Amino acid sequence: MWRLFGKSAHLWPNWLYKLISNIHSKMMKFNHTYIGEIIIGDHILMLETIGNKSKQVRKTPLTYANYENSYIVAASFSGSDKTPDWYHNLSTYNPYITVDSVRFEATYELIESSEKDFFWSLLDEVYPTFQMYRKRTTRDIPLIKFSKV
């Protein structure tokens, strides 16, 4: 769904953003069908974190780029000046990731500033709208590398 509406997501009220994200999560089962690729695109993983405050499982669909045996994601929040909640939840427990219907525990590391240009180029190839997100926000968008445990 972000492929269809992602360019304006920064203007949405928080409740709409959460609703669309929820629908997107439920549509992940269609990821490998023609319809699924049109609506949600390929290169989407499902990140599962534990909420820092709620202690509940939080699922977030994210666009990723492959790099060696890892997955690169951006904490872009559609170019918002606010950092997404899932990013803050990473510090609590190791996250789980589902990619191509395979779920696994993952570790993560923040990508250093000196490496960001290279990894942004990988992400931009997958989803060119990331370029707009970087222009739209005043914050330095964190890039995260997830690897299997």
Regions found by a protein language model. Give the residues of each.
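Compositionally biased, charge-rich terminal segments
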Residues: 1-15
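Short, conserved active-site entrance elements at the starts or edges of catalytic domains
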Residues: 12-51, 57
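Short secondary-structure transition/capping segments
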Residues: 12-18, 124, 144-149
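Short beta-strand segments
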Residues: 42-78
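Short beta-strand micro-motifs in enzyme catalytic cores
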Residues: 45, 140-144
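Short, structured beta-strand-loop surface elements
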Residues: 77-130, 136-140, 148-149
